[in-house]
From Swiss-Prot:
Modified residues (Phosphoserine): S43, S181, S185, S187
Pfam families to which the protein is assigned, alphabetical: Ribosomal_L13
Protein name, as recorded: Large ribosomal subunit protein uL13B
Gene: RPL16B
Organism of provenance: Saccharomyces cerevisiae (strain ATCC 204508 / S288c)
Domain of life: Eukaryota
GO molecular function, one term: structural constituent of ribosome
GO biological process: cytoplasmic translation; maturation of LSU-rRNA; negative regulation of translation
PTM-bearing positions, type N-acetylserine: S2
Note: There are 2 genes for uL13 in yeast.
Quaternary data: Component of the large ribosomal subunit (LSU). Mature yeast ribosomes consist of a small (40S) and a large (60S) subunit. The 40S small subunit contains 1 molecule of ribosomal RNA (18S rRNA) and 33 different proteins (encoded by 57 genes). The large 60S subunit contains 3 rRNA molecules (25S, 5.8S and 5S rRNA) and 46 different proteins (encoded by 81 genes).
Length: 198
């Protein structure tokens, strides 16, 4: 990738496949920001994935529950934990790699104005057979105790309205510029200059 910061839109990506790609890149020194973590997908039906998460919730230190493992409910933390498991996070190299990673639900500023990319090898439509069942990470998180799905959805609706307004203005401006340049190229002065080789 080799850009200063790569912003990945996680919508409709498979959790594990995206995590492995990101883990490789952050270890190689690439700074990565992941947005819309709540729109990630996990293969398999919702009920099965919920049972798997409840199995994970039962894992705890027998004599002192505060010692871990810690069961994060937010989609951003679930993705972070998946990536952390693919990085040697207890070494200096692994810690430095994880510091190059940021994960968000929704698309907060300033990343709403940055160009976002997708990871083709992790996209659900390219990886899952059509008709196979899948689960949205936001839905799974909400079912196990994440409380902010409505808040993120509301903020995303506002962002989409702002984005549509900006795009409409940009399109109108581009149209004006193209029509003005077309008019200028058809003028008598332009024809005369063209005859002199300009």
């Amino acid at each position: 990738m080799s850009q200063p910061v790569v912003v990945i839109d996680a919508k409709d990506h498979l959790l594990g496949r995206l995590a492995s790609t990101i883990a490789k890149q952050v270890l190689n020194g690439q700074k990565i920001v992941v947005v819309r973590a709540e729109a990630l997908n996990i293969s398999g039906e919702f009920f099965r994935n919920k049972l798997k998460y409840h199995d994970f919730l039962r894992k705890a230190t027998a004599f002192n529950k505060t010692r871990g493992p810690f069961h994060f409910r937010a989609p951003s933390r679930i993705l972070y934990k998946a990536i952390r498991g693919m990085v040697s996070h207890k070494t200096a190299r692994g810690k430095a790699a994880l510091e190059r990673l940021k994960i968000f639900e929704g698309i907060p500023p300033p990343y709403d104005k940055k160009k976002r990319v997708v990871v083709p090898q992790a996209l659900r439509v390219l990886r899952l057979k059509p008709g196979r069942k899948y689960t949205t990470l936001g839905k799974l998180s909400t079912s196990v105790g994440w409380k902010y799905e409505d808040v993120v959805a509301k903020l995303e609706d506002k962002r989409k309205v702002r984005s549509a307004e900006y795009y409409a203005k940009k399109r109108a401006f581009t149209k004006k510029v193209s029509s003005a340049s077309a008019a200028a190229s058809e003028s008598d002065v332009a024809k005369q200059l063209a005859s002199f080789g300009y």
